[in-house]
Amino acid sequence: PELSLTGYSLLDATSDVARRIDSPEIQTLIATTAEGKLDLVFGFVEESEEHILYNAAIYCSEGKIRHLHRKVYLPTYGMFDEGRLFGRGGSFRSFPTRFGRLGILICEDVWHPSASYLLAQDGAICLLALVNGPVKGIGKTGLGAQKAWHSLVAHETMIHGMYGVFANRVGTEDGATFFGASAIFDPFGQKIAEGERFTEQLLTVDLDLEHVRRARFQMPLLRDEDIDLTIRELQRIRRRRTGEGE
């Protein structure tokens, strides 16, 4: 899950629990993948060489870091205060693994459609969503948090024809309860595995990459996407917003 090494409600302790990539703690975790029997992704507070703190996640394999993602969208509303604690990441990029190209999003990132769009256009066949999702419902509708998150990830996997892994924490921290219910969705948006609510659990699931192929044949949205049109329209919108005209 998000910030899986530290917990979420860090406040003034954020700098105390931060670790550089070359720290013994991080290197020990990376070393567990050296034999090639497993790949590992985990969330932590990263301290950069410039001493900027990031809400970050590392994917490691065969004893090496394959990708570092720094959370881009930092919620600073309601119970969240990340904009005060962390620097903002600057990219959404897929990365190669022995299973194919993957992409990581951290919690609030998932709620921005452009994030998963960029990962899919960059070749990702699986979305890894690292989350600290509290029980509190979404908006005035009272939509349950679990239903909202599962619906969101299912939608993104379906429209992009890729797998989705939703990894959410459990437990209570500073009055906030996190519901767990981690789940895996196939490229058709169907839930194929789900963990229990409020209970730590290991899910072991085989993912058939043939389903990615089938999904993209049956609904070729990725093939038909017009990136150039999207870029042109975004440039036009930016000009209008900055007062430069259409």
Residue ranges and their predicted role:
Residues 1-17, 129-132:
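Short, conserved active-site loops that position catalytic residues or coordinate cofactors/metal ions
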Residues 69, 95, 167, 195, ...:
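Hydrophobic residues at beta-strand termini and immediately following loops
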